[in-house]
């Protein structure tokens, strides 16, 4: 069963998809990570919710610069309160 998105999650993922479809092709490949920062952001928002997902995405975007080596960086799994 698919998880229902909140309106903020829908808005954020729609804006990111717009960037992927309209702006990113003009800029060319720039991201140092796999998955790309925009795909990471969408996955983080879907998995962790709007606030925490945007926080993960912002931290990731701040790491995406020429001085960082990049590489594999998947979205962290969602931790439950009972997990330690």
From Swiss-Prot:
Keyword Metal-binding: no
Cited SMART domains: Haemolytic
Localization of this protein: Cell inner membrane
Membrane association type: Peripheral membrane protein
Transmembrane segments: none
Listed InterPro entries: Membr_insert_effic_factor_YidD (IPR002696)
Protein purpose: Could be involved in insertion of integral membrane proteins into the membrane.
Protein name: Putative membrane protein insertion efficiency factor
Natural source organism: Shewanella halifaxensis (strain HAW-EB4)
């Amino acid at each position: 069963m698919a998880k229902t998105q909140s309106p903020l999650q829908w808005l954020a993922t729609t804006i990111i998809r717009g960037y992927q479809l309209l702006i990113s092709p003009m800029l060319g490949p720039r991201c140092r990570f796999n998955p790309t920062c925009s795909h990471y952001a969408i996955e983080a928002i879907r998995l962790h919710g709007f606030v925490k997902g945007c926080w993960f995405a912002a931290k990731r975007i701040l790491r995406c610069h020429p001085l960082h080596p990049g590489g594999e960086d998947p979205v962290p799994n969602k931790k439950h309160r009972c997990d330690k």
